[in-house]
Regions:
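Solvent-exposed loop/turn segments at secondary-structure junctions
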Residues: 13-17, 52-55, 84, 123-127, ...
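C-terminal "exit" segments of structured domains
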Residues: 178-259
Length: 259
């Protein structure tokens, strides 16, 4: 009978991201179309759009039957038209809204559902380099893992490289993975198709061959950060722990550079 999948897309609509609206829509189409037509009636697709730490995320939930044209109508920067170029992203608030969605374990026909959240961002999360009192994305990733929700992070642009190891660890902590934007459509459509057709899980498709595909045509190299990712997962419980980890890592780099 196969699996089907419920998906939540978390979209960072700062002004630089809004400039990529056409390419973002194109990649989301690939994700949507990866769900076979005969599985779409039982699936749900939600969109969470967020901007600054001062704005509330905008949530749209599409229930069956899914419609790509209706989806495209809601994919537009919904908040301040002038955008928000600089500053950190309130990833915790967006992920909290993910947890608040009406996730299911099976569809109406009793078919097992995989639960997927895709975070698309180009910025540094609040709480990584500075203290922040909002929702803790690292703690939420543990909640996602406990509820069987897999997180995949899509990193956009060059600025993301300063924290792509964090986003990689955040996704890995749930059984997911990190993808550079350039490869997102190809990887996501392939992975979703495999999971639905072969009745497998996201964690099972996270293989060495997958990482070779993820790294193609990009600056992202998982092998360069693998040890840091594993350390964050094994040693950190909160964003405060993550922030200390990053601080110590930067100190060690500076020490090595001067030794």
């Amino acid at each position: 009978m196969g699996n089907t999948i419920d998906t939540a897309m978390c979209l960072d609509w700062t002004s630089l991201m809004a400039l990529r609206i056409s390419s973002i829509k194109e990649k989301i189409r690939y994700v949507f179309n990866a769900v076979p037509i005969n599985k779409r009636d039982g699936a749900r697709f939600s969109v969470i759009q967020f901007q600054t730490p001062d704005d509330q995320p905008v949530i749209t939930t599409m229930v069956p039957p899914l419609n790509i044209h209706a989806l495209e109508q809601i994919l537009a920067p919904p908040l301040r038209q002038q955008g928000y170029i600089d500053g950190n992203r309130d990833i915790g608030a967006a992920l909290r809204e993910v947890m608040n969605l009406p996730w299911r374990d099976t569809d109406e026909n009793g078919v097992f559902l995989e639960k997927l959240a895709v975070l698309v961002t180009d910025g540094v999360p609040c709480g990584l380099f500075d203290a922040f009192n909002g929702d803790d994305p690292w703690e939420i990733s543990n909640e996602m893992c406990n509820q069987g929700i897999t997180l995949i992070v899509v990193g956009v642009g060059e600025s993301i490289t300063q924290c792509d190891d964090f986003y990689c660890a955040l996704a890995h902590n749930t059984g997911g993975f990190y993808i550079p934007f350039i490869n997102a459509d190809r990887i996501l459509s392939s992975v979703i198709g495999t999971i639905i057709h072969d009745q497998t899980t996201f964690n099972q498709v996270r293989t060495h061959d997958l990482y070779e595909e993820i790294e193609k045509n990009s600056l992202f190299k998982y092998s360069y950060m693998e040890s840091r990712v594993k350390c964050m997962i094994h040693e950190c419980q909160t964003m405060n722990d993550i922030r200390r980890f990053f601080y110590n890592h930067r100190l060690s780099i500076q020490h090595d550079a001067h030794s």
